[in-house]
Amino acid sequence: MIFRLADFHFPDSAARLYPDTPQRPWILEVGFGDGRFWPHYAATFPEAPNYLGVEISGVSLLKAERRLREAGLSNAVLTKLPATPLIREVVPAGSLDAIVVNFPDPWPKAGHAEHRLLRAPFFRLAASRLKPGGAVLLTTDHDEYFEFACREAEASGVMRAELTDPPPAALETKYARKWRELGLEVQHARFVPTHHPHVPHGTVARFPDSEDAPAVPHAILTLPAAFDPGAFHKHTARGGQTREDPVGWTVVLLELYRSLKQDGWVMLAHVVEGELTQEVLIGISARGDGSHLVRLASFGGPIITPGVKAAVGVVTDWLEEQGAAVRHRGY
């Protein structure tokens, strides 16, 4: 089953995601490619574990969904998302039996190491979400990345590396077959938590069932009689940096469209928060008392994050710069 970001709860649970098999082990695979690994690996268990697969390629998502469906693996959830925000916001503490990472992108160029998945912050996050006895399983053909991952695991202070042979299923992936045909070797490690740190979930929420719910970021304002939407130009704002989150958020207001259904406009905004990116619509609609409501729209299934709240604020601030009088801020 393919899930959108908005289909998850924050955090979620195996009981909700896998209502027919909640008691089974729960395994997450990062970068499942065309889905060859999981049918082979699941077959090594008496009963197929519950599976959560995360991938950033839409084409791979569709291929893997078909492969798992044909294999009869119904207790599998696939999603197109970066791994870190999914693990941090969706997965409860101490709930995973394993996190599988087969042939991750090694980002081999100088200066690109910061893009690698298996760095110390990821290992701390993984340790917080793994059950006692769980592990991160890495299989790779890239020797330097393998050594890098082992160093980062040690630097995390919460993981130790056990060097072992890869599970046979890891050698059935597309890349593993390619490297074996070329006579190249692969390396494998089990990164086992020595400590389970507390890594909190962020302030993330699902879009409420009703757009009128107070939890939907919004503002109420009065536009000037001379408001000119043609004055809009692409606009970028940044903020939200803290000691815990030095990156914060970036909001780019891309386009302002006239609404065909009601008196008002719709703003398209691009919101970036670390590895998580969303494109959201923010409505500017007329109210019966002559004021306008600025509000996040449900279209596209956004989740409500600090950056999305900030996007509503950035739109409100821009309208204020155009002469609007803000009566209420609900973000």
Swiss-Prot record:
Pathway: tRNA modification; N(7)-methylguanine-tRNA biosynthesis. SUPFAM superfamilies: S-adenosyl-L-methionine-dependent methyltransferases. It catalyses: guanosine(46) in tRNA + S-adenosyl-L-methionine = N(7)-methylguanosine(46) in tRNA + S-adenosyl-L-homocysteine. The active site is at 105. Its EC number is 2.1.1.33. It comes from the Bacteria. Disulfide bonds: none annotated. Substrate binds at residues 109, 141. GO terms for molecular function: tRNA (guanine(46)-N7)-methyltransferase activity. Pfam families: Methyltransf_4. Keywords: Methyltransferase, S-adenosyl-L-methionine, Transferase, tRNA processing. Gene3D superfamilies: Vaccinia Virus protein VP39. GO terms for cellular component: tRNA methyltransferase complex. S-adenosyl-L-methionine binds at residues 29, 55, 105. Belongs to the class I-like SAM-binding methyltransferase superfamily. TrmB family. Catalyzes the formation of N(7)-methylguanine at position 46 (m7G46) in tRNA. HAMAP family: tRNA_methyltr_TrmB. This is tRNA (guanine-N(7)-)-methyltransferase. The gene is trmB.
